[in-house]
C-alpha cells in the first residue's frame, strides 16, 4: 500500500513554521518537549469552547511566550482579562518561568483545517449525516477563497456494522508540491457507535518568494489543424 508523508512535516522550513521554537541540549531537550506537550494539553482542555486552532511556544532567555490562535478571542480573554490572567499564572507555575500570552484571532475559520475538522466532528456527534457535514464544510471553504479542500471521515459511519472511509473533495489539493500552502489537521468525533476520525486538507495557494501567489487558470492549448 502507498504510504503518505505528513503534509505539514514535509513542508517545515519551506512554507510552514515550527510551533515550538527554542534551543536545548541533552536532558533539557526532553524536559522542554514534555513541558510543551503538557502546556498544549492543559490549554486545549481549558479552552475547549474557544475554537483554538494552534498553540505556538517560544522560549527566549529564561521566559516563555505562548501564542494562542483562536476564532473566539473573547472567550480566552474573559471579562476584563481575568481568564487570560488566570491562565498566565497557572502556566507560570507549571513551566517555572515567567510566561507571556499573546492571542491571535483567526478571521477566517472556514479556511483553518483544525477548526473545520472540529466543526465536522461536532456535527457527527449531533448525528448530522456525514455527507451533509462534509459537503457543507467544503462549500463554505471554497466560498471564502480556498483553492481546494479535501475532507475524509473514517469509522462506523451512520452506525454501520463495518467501519469504512468516505471522502469529499473540491478544487486542487497538490500534496506533492512543496511550495503549496496546505493546511492539514485531524480531529476525533466520539459517537455512540465509537470514534470517527476526521481529516482535513485545505489548499490555500502557492507560496513563491515568501508570499502567496494567486493561481491563474491555464488557457487551453490551441488545437492543431489537421493536414489535408
Curated annotation (Swiss-Prot):
Which is one Gene Ontology cellular component term of this protein?
Answer: cytosolic small ribosomal subunit
Q: Which residues form the KH type-2 domain?
A: 39-107
Pfam entry (one): Ribosomal_S3_C
The family database entries (Gene3D superfamilies) matched by this protein are listed as:
3.30.300.20, Ribosomal protein S3, C-terminal domain
Q: One biological-process term from Gene Ontology?
A: translation
Q: Which InterPro entries match?
A: KH_dom, KH_dom-like_a/b, KH_dom_type_2, KH_sf_prok-type, Ribosomal_S3_C_sf, Ribosomal_uS3_bac-typ, Ribosomal_uS3_C, Ribosomal_uS3_CS
Task: Show the CDD domains listed in the entry.
Answer: KH-II_30S_S3
Q: Which GO terms describe its molecular function?
A: mRNA binding; rRNA binding; structural constituent of ribosome
Per UniProt, the keywords (alphabetical) are: Ribonucleoprotein, Ribosomal protein, RNA-binding, rRNA-binding
Query: Which SMART domains does this chain map to?
Result: KH
* Family listed: Belongs to the universal ribosomal protein uS3 family.
Q: What does this protein do?
A: Binds the lower part of the 30S subunit head. Binds mRNA in the 70S ribosome, positioning it for translation.
State whether it acts alone or in a complex, and with which partners, per the record.
Answer: Part of the 30S ribosomal subunit. Forms a tight complex with proteins S10 and S14.
Query: PANTHER family, from UniProt?
Result: 30S/40S RIBOSOMAL PROTEIN S3, SMALL RIBOSOMAL SUBUNIT PROTEIN US3C
Q: What is the protein's name according to its record?
A: Small ribosomal subunit protein uS3
